[in-house]
């Protein structure tokens, strides 16, 4: 199969050969969903904190004597049963949200995503991508000429100028093939891959 070559003026050129084992697979929606959700979960860090009965600032004095008042017995006012008391199972920043996806499933999910992008015409190949200086304007003008506004760039050689020029563009992400993740692939409207990076992707996902 072939991926379309995107020229600097935004026109599509001749096709570039690509492996059908990576870019020609059937779309497995359930697997892609599982891989994306697992990626998001593994990137998540806990930021919720609630107090249990030990952490609540209350006196430990017994509110009233054990027997003889007619009330239910009570040990301390920090009890989870009381208003203002601690939580029984409080949320903690140390919670583990990670989900396990084995390598075989992850690679199959990535192949499915790349294949769907190829079918939808959202992935194109460029000979190379570089800028002469680490200037955001240079890269922004290049993408504007190509008709791109939201783009994930997968390059075989992430040089410093390209990285620095892309860093201040809100809807542009430049990565190497081994750092391309499922969430970014489905998030951006277009995916640009350099010719050399196509071979690297095929090697990673074979």
UniProtKB/Swiss-Prot annotation:
**An individual GO BP term:** translation
Protein name per Swiss-Prot or TrEMBL: Large ribosomal subunit protein uL4
UniProt GO molecular function? rRNA binding; structural constituent of ribosome
Q: Which Pfam families match?
A: Ribosomal_L4
On whether Ribonucleoprotein is a keyword of this UniProt record, the answer is yes
In which family does this protein belong, per the annotation? Belongs to the universal ribosomal protein uL4 family.
List the GO terms this entry assigns under cellular component, sorted alphabetically.
ribonucleoprotein complex; ribosome
Compositionally biased residues, Basic and acidic residues: 49-58
Keywords associated with the record: Ribonucleoprotein, Ribosomal protein, RNA-binding, rRNA-binding
Question: What does the UniProt function comment say about this protein?
Answer: One of the primary rRNA binding proteins, this protein initially binds near the 5'-end of the 23S rRNA. It is important during the early stages of 50S assembly. It makes multiple contacts with different domains of the 23S rRNA in the assembled 50S subunit and ribosome. Forms part of the polypeptide exit tunnel.
Keyword RNA-binding applies: yes
Oligomeric and partner information: Part of the 50S ribosomal subunit.
Residue spans of biased composition, Basic residues class: 59-70
Renumbered to this chain, region (Disordered) spans 43-78
């Amino acid at each position: 199969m072939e991926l379309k070559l995107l020229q600097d003026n935004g026109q599509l050129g001749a096709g570039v050969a690509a492996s059908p084992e990576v870019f020609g697979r059937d779309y497995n929606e359930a697997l892609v969903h599982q891989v994306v959700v697992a990626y998001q979960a593994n990137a998540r860090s806990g930021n919720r904190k609630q107090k249990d009965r030990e952490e609540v600032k209350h006196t430990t004095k017994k509110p009233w004597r054990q027997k003889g008042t007619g009330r239910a017995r009570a040990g301390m006012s920090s009890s989870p049963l009381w208003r203002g008391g601690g939580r029984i199972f409080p949320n903690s920043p140390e919670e583990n949200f990670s989900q396990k996806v084995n390598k075989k499933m992850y690679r199959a999910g990535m192949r499915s995503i790349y294949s769907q992008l190829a079918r939808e015409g959202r992935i194109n190949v460029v000979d190379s991508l570089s800028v002469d200086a680490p200037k955001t304007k240079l890269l922004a003008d290049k993408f504007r000429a190509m008709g791109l506004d939201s783009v994930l760039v997968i390059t075989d050689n992430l040089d410093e100028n390209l990285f620095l020029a892309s860093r201040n563009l809100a809807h542009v992400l430049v990565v190497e093939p081994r750092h391309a993740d499922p969430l970014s692939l489905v998030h951006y409207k277009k995916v640009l891959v350099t010719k050399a990076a196509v071979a690297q992707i095929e090697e990673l996902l074979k």
